[in-house]
A protein has these predicted regions:
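Thiol-based oxidoreductase modules, predominantly thioredoxin-like and allied folds used
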Residues: 8-10, 29-44
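Non-catalytic, surface beta->alpha helical segment in thiol-disulfide oxidoreductase systems
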Residues: 61-91
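Short, aromatic/basic amphipathic alpha-helical patches
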Residues: 22-24, 47-51
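Structural micro-motif
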Residues: 49-61
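Glycine-/small-residue-rich active-site loops that bind phosphorylated ligands and cofactors
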Residues: 13-14, 40, 73
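Short acidic, gly/pro-rich beta-turn/loop elements at beta-sheet edges
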Residues: 17, 58, 69
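Local sequence-structure signature of Cys/Sec-based thiol-disulfide redox active-site neighborhoods
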Residues: 1-29
Length: 91
């Protein structure tokens, strides 16, 4: 099942690292969207508020899982991986 992965960045080195980690580890069916928190875009502002993004990098999966910072685990799409995220990082 494809997932929506949203990454909130601030242009920092760690943010770029997270984007690269997720880009390499996600499957071809998952949708990746990257948002710059410094943007004046209304969609970005609303998503930041909705997900309570107060630090970057932050990864939100399917609107119900949030990982803040650089993950200390490998990012590989798969059912077991998303169960792990859901168990440990639910919003």
């Amino acid at each position: 099942m494809p997932h929506l992965i949203e990454i909130f960045t601030g242009g920092c080195t760690l943010c770029r690292k997270v984007v690269n980690i997720v880009t390499v580890g996600k499957c071809k069916d998952c949708v990746l969207r990257v948002f710059d928190v410094d943007s004046d875009d209304e969609e970005v502002r609303m998503k930041r508020e909705h997900y309570n993004i107060t630090a970057v990098p932050a990864i939100v999966v399917d609107g119900r899982i949030k990982v803040v910072g650089v993950p200390d685990f490998p990012w590989f799409c798969g059912d077991d991986f998303y169960r792990f995220l859901d168990k440990n990082f639910s919003l």
